[in-house]
Amino acid sequence: MTEYDLVLTDVRVVTDDRDEARAADIAVRDGKIVEVAPGLDTAGARDVVEGGGKLAFPGVVDAHQHWGIYNPLDQDASVESRACAQGGVTSALTYMRTGQYYLNKGGDYADFFPEVLERTADRAHVDYAYHLAPMSKGHIAEIPDLVREHGVTSFKVFMFYGGHGLHGRSADQSSFLMTPEGERYDYAHFEFVMRGVQEARERFPDIADQISLSLHCETAEIMSAYTQLVEEAGELTGLAAYSASRPPHSEGLAVSIASYLAHETGLPTINLLHLSSRKAVDAAVRMGRAFPHIDFRREVTVGHLLADITTAHGPGGKVNPPLRPREDVEALWEYVLDGTVDWVVSDHACCREEAKFGEPKDDVFLAKSGFGGAEYLLPGMVTEGTRRGLSLGRIAALTAWNPARRYGLPTKGRLAAGFDADIALVDPDHTWTVRAADSESAQEYTPFEGFELTARVTDTFLRGTRVLTDGKVVGEPTGRYLHRPTGR
């Protein structure tokens, strides 16, 4: 008789390495999966959970969130991680930077980042890690210490921040970014960030493949000009106006610039974030052909796959890059289905009503950018993906295996012996209507309000401990900071 802490019986196990699910039980000991096989002996198990034939997905590795951007960081860690559990997310990788929002301060990461860790310790219901954005020359010099001391292996550039605001046009981005006097956040800075990340890869060759740079690809000059054109014409309103003010070719141009800079600096690990349009992904594909020595990874969000400028529920759907017309949504699905897209994320950024909307409330240019959505990530992908012929295994790759490999999480992303027992049980035949009131998030609205989904996460396990039961978060926070690469 083998002793287990948990045996999950009668589930259909989904893994990235096979298209369809297979019937099996999952045995867990000390937070790790020790066996996946049919008919496991449960006599010595401390806990047995009957899966009822549900799909067992690896816990989602949501590689793009924004804890603390609009709410206190400790609050988001506690509350928004509950929404994560609802969506089957067990590892949340959240972007962080100095400047306005977040901790609302500048300075060195040597002082800033320990405060970030302190504010989130013992609060999250899921495991978490941080990507950091080098906003100054001093931050670039800190990259090796961030890798060595804090296990931060992924960094970010916001390509439009130097000349265009987070929510629209801005004449004073230096104050917003809190960059040192005399420094510019521009293409030259992006080049030097790339050189700094590449130097870190060379300094730590054993983990070089896990050290990468992610880029938000939009072009400030194009967006500023088109925002003025849209406002002066006055013909478009709402999300259609916002999409037109940040046109897809702005993404494509930024992708092209970022790609050439990667070639110039010799940095091969580049992640192109939340590509929202056919033109953006087309540019990414073209750059991959032009620079085959660069290991590009391409990301899209579940929001851009589920909603468009017409179906999203009002200006609450404002986000960067914008939600697009339906033809771009269809194009993104083409790229998901043909394997061009590497992973799908939520870009979860809880923005409560009092912060989100301006006056008048329906003026999209007065609204803030971003919304929550982690709770709909896996349900949305299973619902819409399977409807379009996407295999279950490919969904597991897009939501867990691929981001875990890129971002230095070797024990995450697969339901197999030796991996963390991060498990999401999904009922693929549960039809339900999205209502913001049913979410654990502090956000009172959702752009997906009224959407009908046909799959639901019923139970979520973090390292073998159940954190979601019958759709409700249970227990105290047990999430841990992921010092990457984990297990090193």
Where are the language model's segments positioned?
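Divalent metal-coordination and catalytic microenvironments
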Residues: 11, 31, 53, 64, ...
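Metal-associated gating/positioning segment near the N- to mid-region
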Residues: 51-123
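N-terminal metal-binding scaffold of metallo-dependent hydrolase/deaminase domains
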Residues: 1-44
